[in-house]
């Protein structure tokens, strides 16, 4: 007997993530719907996450919920903690929680790689929420973000991969979905390098089972 088909809604802050998450959902034989609002992250980076921005975020999540998904994933690590608290009638998941849980289960020195500064504190806080004694070490790679914004995705993943290779850690967390393409250049590393999209989709499917 076939398992029921789940519809997963995604709120993104960059168009590039639509293809990534669509492919992961299609692999599992489910449906997806996407809403992209780049201004949410742009304003968070420029001004921080205040009440007005949180209200806008929750409004966009309600728009997405009106499409009828069974579960929603916010794929922006800067904002996903606020998305979890939207209080919608469907579950709203943060993209990086399953990854964080896996990282603290591995333990040791956890290096957090991010190319957007506003992602660092939320990811650190999430790891410490998962394990209060986690040894979290921030490893920003902020100069690479200009490559992403310019559309130089190959240069971006090369820069991220080169940065990851300099780190001394027991597990490395790629704190943004945009960092995932760098994984293809890091297959020879013996240290686990974790990313969020695949585990987030698995968690979303499980949430509706």
Stretches found by the model and what they are:
Residues 1-209:
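Non-catalytic structural scaffold of enzyme domains
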């Amino acid at each position: 007997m076939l398992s029921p088909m789940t519809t997963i809604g995604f709120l993104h802050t960059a168009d590039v993530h639509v293809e990534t998450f669509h492919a992961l959902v299609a692999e599992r034989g489910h449906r997806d719907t996407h809403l992209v609002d780049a201004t949410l992250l742009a304003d968070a980076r420029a001004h921080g996450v205040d009440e007005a921005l949180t209200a806008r975020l929750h409004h966009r999540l309600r728009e997405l919920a009106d499409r009828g998904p069974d579960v929603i994933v916010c794929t922006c690590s800067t904002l996903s903690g606020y998305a979890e608290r939207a209080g919608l009638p469907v579950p709203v998941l943060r993209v990086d929680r399953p990854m964080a849980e896996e990282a603290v289960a591995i333990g040791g020195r956890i290096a957090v790689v991010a190319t957007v500064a506003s992602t660092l504190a939320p990811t650190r806080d999430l790891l410490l929420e998962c394990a209060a004694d986690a040894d979290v070490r921030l490893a920003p790679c902020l100069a690479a973000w200009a490559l992403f914004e310019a559309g130089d995705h190959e240069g971006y993943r090369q820069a991220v991969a080169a940065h990851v290779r300099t780190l001394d850690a027991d597990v490395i967390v790629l704190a943004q979905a945009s960092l995932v393409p760098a994984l293809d250049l890091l297959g020879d590393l013996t240290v686990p390098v974790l990313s969020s999209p695949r585990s987030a989709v698995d968690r979303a499917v499980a949430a509706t089972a």
